[in-house]
């Protein structure tokens, strides 16, 4: 195994390199139950409602292809513990019908493994980011939406300032 699971400064627990990991290495498979898109949507909504009610209900659903997703909310899926970063050192890739977490760069022993969760803007306020990256915008949103988010936040701050 190339990794250890331990406490993370980003969020709860995380995955850390046990040894130096070369660029483009298959680090860990993201495993879980293969489910239809309809079931995926149902579970996603259910878990988001749980999260709003009691702070739990994390969603670990990954898109596999146009017909199926993987629900990684199973105890044996250690990849679900990989935290988000706005400057990730890994990314998920579908390879031969499996989801793999692949290193984007050389990762040194002890470094936390991260990837960009790629959330849309729709519910950004529900997903604050604590990655600490210089590129961090304060919320977990996909890279191509960060410019728009910065504009939204700037407009919001202006409105708040006028209220005072």
Describe the predicted segments one by one.
Residues 1-92:
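Catalytic cores of histone-lysine modification enzymes
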Residues 85-164:
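C-terminal SET catalytic tail plus cysteine-rich post-SET Zn-binding segment of SAM-dependent SET-domain
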């Amino acid at each position: 195994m190339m990794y250890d699971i331990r406490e993370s400064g980003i969020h709860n627990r995380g995955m850390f390199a046990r040894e130096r990991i070369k660029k483009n290495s298959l680090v860990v498979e993201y495993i879980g139950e293969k489910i239809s898109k309809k079931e995926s949507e149902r579970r996603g909504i259910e878990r988001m409602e749980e999260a709003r009610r009691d702070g739990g209900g994390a969603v670990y659903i990954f898109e596999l292809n146009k017909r199926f997703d993987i629900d990684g909310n199973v105890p044996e899926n250690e990849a679900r513990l990989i935290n988000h970063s706005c400057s990730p050192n890994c990314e998920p890739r579908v390879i031969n019908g499996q989801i793999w977490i692949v290193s984007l760069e050389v990762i040194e022993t002890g470094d936390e493994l991260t990837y960009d969760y790629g959330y849309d803007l729709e519910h950004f306020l529900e997903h604050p980011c604590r990655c600490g990256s210089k590129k961090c915008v304060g919320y977990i949103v996909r890279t191509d939406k960060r410019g728009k988010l910065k504009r939204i936040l700037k407009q919001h701050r202006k409105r708040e300032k006028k209220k005072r």
